[in-house]
């Protein structure tokens, strides 16, 4: 069973996690930027994470990546609401970064960030990022601009035709 990964969600989640880990701004454009802003709204609906209990089970650095993936999947599978599970998963990652800021090497953290971004970009979690509303608004605005430009072009073309017709009528009078 294969599932697709939404590249825009992947970019947005990766930029969000990199922002938190490196404490720097990472800029994304287009749909990814809108999704990135929607990620901040997910924190209003998060479950409580018993982080101290979870961290006690953390293995050494050689197996920490698999532990993060297993823990994240466990946290996210316990929730029925997709928004709550994604928000809780991202909150767990922030806590994990804060706890392990200087204890795990950067390359391993970067691999973990990429893996988590792939998990969250899965089509199963797409509805949590609420990007469908962006498409609907964009399509409505594009149609409105299309109709407005078509109406404007039609009005100008009609005016030119009317002028030419009146000019021809005045020539043959």
Curated annotation (Swiss-Prot):
InterPro entries: Vaccinia_virus_B6. It comes from the Viruses. Induction: Expressed in the early phase of the viral replicative cycle. Keywords: Early protein. Belongs to the orthopoxvirus OPG191 protein family. This is Protein OPG191. It comes from Vaccinia virus (strain Western Reserve) (VACV). The lineage of its organism: Viruses, Varidnaviria, Bamfordvirae, Nucleocytoviricota, Pokkesviricetes. The gene is OPG191.
